């Protein structure tokens, strides 16, 4: 309850800068530590449960079944394997990306994630944490450009909660999506999004 009241309080405050209303380190920074959250990816698979966008530069058009696992390869640096489908791909496809953290909206603690695709044609993307409970879910902001208060939202959920997403996670996603009049869609559709168990 305390988390939800803080979120609502921050959303109602007007910021003189172009920062999103939730970009308030003093009040909400303890729920937006990027590296603290990313360390959870080393222990379990996370699924993109919901999103407000339909197209991604890597996952393609009408992407679905997006999930990620990661392993640490350096100080605050991860090697991530992302699985996804889209309207042209009915089988899961892999994308390998290097993930680091950065400071967005003048924060003193890293609250953003930078993804760099691996391979001959690299692409770089930057997202920002809106909320993390550091065990079940993350709400991520995908800005139109660095420093913008306009963009899309994503809800990532751990593998052990994807079939029963905690209400606080769904509420936070829905609340900020409607602030920008965005429509939330389900990216995780059903159990067919889960990769087949590894064969021994």
Curated annotation (Swiss-Prot):
MF term (GO), any: amine binding
Keyword field: Disulfide bond, Glycoprotein, Secreted, Signal
Intracellular or extracellular location(s): Secreted
Pfam families, alphabetized: His_binding
Gene3D superfamilies referenced in this protein's UniProt entry, alphabetically: 2.40.128.20
Positions bound to histamine 2: 37, 41, 115, 138, 156
Chief location: secreted
Signal sequence, start to end: 1-18
Tissue expression profile of the protein: Expressed in salivary glands.
InterPro entries: Calycin, Tick_his-bd
Function: Salivary tick protein that acts by scavenging histamine at the wound site, outcompeting histamine receptors for histamine, thereby overcoming host inflammatory responses. Binds histamine with a high-affinity (Kd=1.2 nM). Contains two binding histamine sites (H and L), that appear to bind histamine with differing affinities.
SUBUNIT field: Homodimer; disulcde-linked.
Domain notes: Contains 2 sites/pockets that bind histamine with different affinities. Site H (high affinity) is indicated here as binding to histamine 1, and site L (low affinity) is indicated as binding to histamine 2.
Protein name: Male-specific histamine-binding salivary protein
Organism this protein belongs to: Rhipicephalus appendiculatus (Brown ear tick)
